Amino acid sequence: MENFASARFLLPIMVVFIVVILIPFLQSLVFSFTDYSGYNFADAKFVGFANYIRLFHDQQFWSAVGRVALFTVVQVPIMLFLAAAMALALDSMKLHGTKFFRISTFLPYAVPAVVSTLIWGFMYGAKYGLVGSFNGFFGTHLDMLSPSVLLASIGNIVTWEFTGYNMLIFYSSLSTIPHSLYEAASIDGASEWQIIKSIKLPELKGSLAITVIFSIIGSFQLFNEPSILQNMVPGNAITTYYTPNMYAYNLSFSGNQSNYAAALAIVMAVITMAIAYIVQLNSLKEQMK
């Protein structure tokens, strides 16, 4: 009876998991082995691994993967460093206006990604935006929407959006440290840097692993920012395959290739899960040292 009672509490979340995650995943998996175009699945034919073979020879797909990989390697460390620095500053108790600082730092995360991207897109404008005013005042020719710096500009938007979110995770982790450790360190004559190095940073290892995994998943799912900026950048700087998610979206809804888009989504899910698993294993090894 106790097991049955426990199962009843798990039932709602299991139903949500099956309906929202498991069924769509299995449906996409089935689509990826057919020639389904998005109209009538009854007419779809089984094609085996043809979609996956095509995908592994698709230069546009690998170009998109390489772009988000570069984005992840550069943007995630910068964002998490800023988040950790802000959390340490808040936890130091030496920062005036702590509540205001915490709320204002988290506020960008509460702004919808579409709105954030539009705001930054207008500021990036070389003619009428903030960058345009800067160019007019200093006589420069800075263009934040040019193809050479576009990925960095998108990274700046994402960093602005999610630094506060990660900061709260770090700050929550620091808040669990007993004050007795700080008192003992002060009695021993430890400096502020020694306290950070020996007490605070080790405490951040667990939360760092979580934020890294979430950030990697978010980076590989990059869609909103480049999609919104697509109509704001000159020329064809943001292509339909700029990121894997944009490529899958355009294949499915514009190209009537739901089967190929499903195969792409499955491969990206496997890649993302593999990277997240490796990060988690490394984190567990570090915590066991």
Predicted regions: what they are:
Residues E2-K289:
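A structural signal for multi-pass alpha-helical bundles of membrane permease subunits
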